[in-house]
Structures are given as structure tokens and as C-alpha cells.
Amino acid sequence: MQDYSHLEQAIGHAFQNRALLRQALTHPSVGQRNNQRLEFLGDAVLELCVSEKIYEKHPEMHEGAMTQLRQKLVREEKLAQAAQSIHLGDALLMDKSCEATGGRKNPSVLCDAFESVLAAVYLDGGFDAAREMVLRLIGDCSETGDADGKSALQEFLQAQGRPSPCYETVAETGPAHE
């Protein structure tokens, strides 16, 4: 079996069940025993880890803002960056055609692999191990959401106990409206 010690060190977990890690690293292009089911579980584990940390770190934040922050932290781009930081793409098992078309660097593939490995960590080491991986690679969720103007105004008004604003379109300009 391939040596994954560098990857284990990067994610902060030494696997007892190496076959689980191998499955998490197996792209669907290789065969039936791939990482898709683990990806499903990893998505849920990731959302729980991030939600718990946001809840703990931001006691003043209301539900809508917490949801926005979670969406920002678990988006594909962020997970792909985390996967790249530990060279997860290099460890993936995939067929030659997928590799030839840039599969090891594809953000969607990296995001899926990140979630799969997270699920494998969860199954192998429990929730605490999964949480540690998330905190190590995504951060402690201390950043705040960069809300768009409308959302920021609405959140401010809600915090003040005031009614939500009413919006009226005055004009539509730009390339999308020509």
C-alpha cells in the first residue's frame, strides 16, 4: 500500500484503517469502490464542524449571518485551497484520462477529495479528530462574513429591532440589460 504519512501529517491524523484513507483518495474514474459515499458524509461533517465553531466563536451573531459565514467557509474555492495546501491532488488515485485533463488540480475534484478525507478521518478517529482537521486546514472561523450591501443593511435593521427595508428598482443599466 502507498505511503500516506506525509498526508497524514498534514491533516493531523494517523489512520488506523489505511484502507479507509485509500478509499477516500480514490476518484470515481477508477472504479466502484471510490470516494463518493465518503464525500456525502464528509459534507455533513464539515458543515457540523464549521457550524459548531461559528456558534462558539460568535455568540452575538444571528442565524442568518452564521449561515452566510458558514457558506463562505465551506465553498468549493476555500476547500480546494485547503486541499492544495496539503498537496491532496498528488495523493489522489484516478485514471489517466482524468489526470490528463487536469483532474489533480480541478477545484471540484479537490473539494470532493477534501470532504472524502474528512469523512475518513471522522470514521477512523471520531468527531474530535475531524474537528481538528477542519480547524487546522480551514481555520478557526473567526473571520466574519462579507455581506453584500442589501444583506448588511437588513442585518443592521434587524439587530435594531426595525422593519426590513423595501427596495424599488429605479433603473437597470449595464451589459446584462442592453
Residue ranges and their predicted role:
Residues 1-178:
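Double-stranded RNA-binding/processing signature
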